[in-house]
Every structure is written in structure tokens, then in C-alpha cells.
Amino acid sequence: GKENGPKFNPFFIPKMISDIAAGQISIMYGFHGPNYATCSACATSTNAIADAFNLIRLGKANVIVSGGSEAAIAACGVGGFNAMHALSTRNDSPETASRPFSASRDGFIMGEGGGCLVLEELEHAKARGAKIYAEVAGVGRSADAHHLTASHPEGLGAKLVMLNALEDAEMKPEEVDYIN
């Protein structure tokens, strides 16, 4: 009864902690080494890739499975973003409502998905004859330090991230093939 406090399912804690998926993958495949969940909203997967890249170049691991997922399309997710007026109101034209880089944007479109990348130290990959799809040259991270939901009007945070990534990669802007 209530005199003993609320009753909890024995799986309450394991089901609520954010790194349970990473732990389950580790158990399923026998992966050892760094194992944790990155939590940084829309930047989580990119930050997870940056963490993996940094751990590999520091010699802390040879191979890391890195990625993320999102499943926010539920009453609390849609309701919360709607209450913040963060969602686009272009409901009459949903196929053109998403315009993240437009001056006339009026919010974002919710989505769900997930993905993983396997990052591997270059010489380790070459030694096993792996096909090399891409190389991470550098990473940059920064906060806008402007507003809870709006980007800085002059893009200062985005600019700083790109400058940090260029410096980290020791590259010039014209040498860049891809920006995430």
C-alpha cells in the first residue's frame, strides 16, 4: 500500500536511463571500450560522431559505433513544441514548410529517425582492407549563447563552429567537401 511508498517496476531505472541503448548494443555484440550516451538535443548524433572521432585520434579506441535516434512524435513532444510556437504553421503546404536556412522560416517540422556510423582509425581500417567511404578531418562545437530556441540573428554560433572545425582540421574553407 501507500505506507510502503509507490511501487516501481524492477526495470524502471534500466528503461529510463539515456545510455541503455548503448549498453544493450555493447552487450549484444561484445563491444568493449567507451560506452555512453550523448544528450545534446538536435546536435546529439553529430556530437556523438565528434566524440568518437576524438576518442579514436587520442588512441582510446580503434573502432567506435556512433550515432543516435529520435522519437519525439508523441503527444508530449508535439504539444510541447507547439506550445513554444516552434513548429511551422505552413500546414497548407507541408511539402515546402521545412526551410531551415530561409529568412521566411516560421518553425521546424518534426521528424523521427536514427542512424549510426562506424568510425575506425585509418591505419586500422587499411590493415584489414576496409573500404574507406570518408575521413573526418576535424570537428567544431559551440553554443549560440543567444536564445533558448532561436539561432543568433548573425549566425555567430554557426560561424564559430565552422571556424573551430577548420582550425581543428588545419584546412582552408575551399578544401572542405562536406559540412554537417
Model regions and ranges:
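A glycine- and small-aliphatic-rich helix-loop capping segment at beta-alpha/alpha-beta transitions
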Residues: 1-5, 55-58, 78-93, 153-157
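Active-site-proximal gating segment of KS-fold condensing enzymes and close homologs
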Residues: 1-36, 82-86
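Active-site-proximal alpha-helical scaffold in enzymes
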Residues: 21-22, 26-29, 34-70, 108-130
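Acidic, glycine-rich active-site loops and adjacent beta-strand->loop/helix elements
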Residues: 16, 40-44, 68-73, 138-143
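Short acidic, glycine/serine/threonine-rich loops at helix termini
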Residues: 49, 74-80, 146-151
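Condensing-enzyme catalytic core mediating Claisen C-C bond formation in acyl metabolism
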Residues: 92-171, 175-178
